[in-house]
């Protein structure tokens, strides 16, 4: 490959070479053609739907199935706005998506004199549904911004990231981009927090686990933890499949039922892992659960810890790593009450829905 590339080609080359991107979703056009120009040389597959909304949902689905960030390559203006719904969906469901969209040439940014597909401020348009959204007028900032995006995807709560790149910047010549290596680690709770949490778990007589989408990569750790404390596990919609439906402690997606909610509120300990406890999970008229006992909340997003409830202990950390550390720190229980409770809830759900 030549030492000099168009910026658009250099972006794809960097994503392929350093971040393992092998597929992108979008529709090529005159505005973003430089991003497509070098796809074949990088071995990256381009999948083009009929509409950018489809590209966004494909990228979102890609992240669900592969565990990798979905990448959208879009044109400015309507290309981006067509994809707003899947971007918002990925934001709501905490899934990684990189949106690279062309935008108005640098000399026309914010001028509003009518260039094709102009928006007053493209980056601002999507900022509220992205971890960050930037307009990139200096091509040399791109490696740092792409690294920053991957740090969001891998060490924070995953969320979409949008980079708006003016057409003239995409067309500039540059040397191949080199990866900017930065230290990024998922947060780990303090030893004192683990100690207090372990004390609460060891003292509990009927612990319950509510697991959300933050557990999607922590199924094995969740199972071991639940088995160690004999706790029934209620799954939110975003956590379906995290724990096998055949596991005796799996109560399934039954949080919508009033009886289950009342049992949870009466428990002496509820451990909430990686979930917002949102209206969509509860379907109870927008009311938060009124926990009668202690609450332990585990989430990679610190802001989530005090939303909808005030926990007795809040642990900021990755679900899998935190559950593993707790499993090693607690006393293993030998009762079967948790299995019986999970069975009771499963039977209640079947009776309410008429499921076989």
Regions found by a protein language model. Give the residues of each.
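Aromatic-enriched
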Residues: 167-192, 337-338, 349, 353-354
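Active-site diphosphate/adenylate-binding microenvironment
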Residues: 8-13, 18, 27-30, 35-40, ...
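Glycine-rich beta-alpha junction loops
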Residues: 28-31, 104-105, 165-171, 213-215, ...
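Structural signature of the thiamine diphosphate
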Residues: 22-23, 64-101, 127-178, 200, ...
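Short gly/pro/ser/thr-enriched loop/turn and capping motifs at secondary-structure boundaries
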Residues: 53-56, 80-81, 104-109, 170, ...
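Short glycine/serine/threonine-rich phosphate/pyrophosphate-binding segments
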Residues: 32-34, 54-58, 78-87, 91, ...
């Amino acid at each position: 490959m030549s030492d000099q590339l168009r910026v658009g080609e250099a972006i794809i080359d960097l994503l392929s070479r350093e971040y393992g991107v092998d597929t992108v979703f979008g529709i090529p056009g005159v505005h973003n053609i430089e991003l497509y120009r070098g796809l074949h040389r990088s071995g990256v597959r381009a999948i083009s739907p009929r509409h950018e909304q489809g590209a966004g949902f494909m990228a979102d689905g890609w992240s669900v199935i592969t565990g990798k960030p979905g990448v959208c390559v879009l044109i400015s203006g309507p290309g981006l706005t067509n994809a707003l719904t899947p971007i918002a969906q990925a934001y709501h469901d905490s899934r990684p998506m990189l949106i690279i969209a062309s935008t108005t040439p640098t000399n026309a940014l914010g001028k509003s004199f009518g260039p094709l597909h102009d928006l007053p401020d493209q980056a601002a348009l999507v900022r509220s549904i992205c971890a960050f959204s930037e307009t990139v007028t200096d091509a040399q900032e791109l490696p740092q911004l792409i690294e920053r995006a991957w740090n969001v995807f891998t060490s924070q709560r995953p969320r979409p990231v949008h980079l708006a790149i003016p057409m003239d910047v995409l067309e500039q010549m540059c040397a191949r981009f080199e990866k900017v290596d930065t230290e990024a680690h998922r947060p780990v709770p303090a030893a004192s927090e683990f100690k207090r949490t372990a004390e609460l778990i060891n003292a509990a007589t009927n612990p319950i686990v509510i697991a959300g989408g933050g557990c999607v990569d922590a199924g094995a750790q969740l199972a071991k933890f639940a088995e160690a404390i004999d706790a029934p596990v209620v799954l939110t919609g975003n956590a379906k499949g995290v724990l096998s439906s055949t596991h005796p402690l799996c109560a399934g997606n039954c949080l919508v039922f009033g009886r289950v909610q009342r049992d949870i509120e009466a428990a002496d300990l509820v451990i909430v892992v990686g979930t917002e406890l949102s209206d969509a999970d509860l379907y109870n008229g927008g009311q938060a659960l009124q926990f009668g006992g202690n609450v332990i909340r585990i989430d990679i997003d610190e802001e989530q810890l005090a939303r909808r409830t005030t926990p007795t202990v809040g642990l900021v950390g990755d679900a899998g790593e935190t559950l593993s550390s707790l499993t090693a720190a607690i006393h293993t229980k030998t009762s079967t009450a948790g299995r019986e409770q999970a069975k009771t809830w499963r039977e209640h759900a079947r009776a309410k829905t008429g499921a076989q």
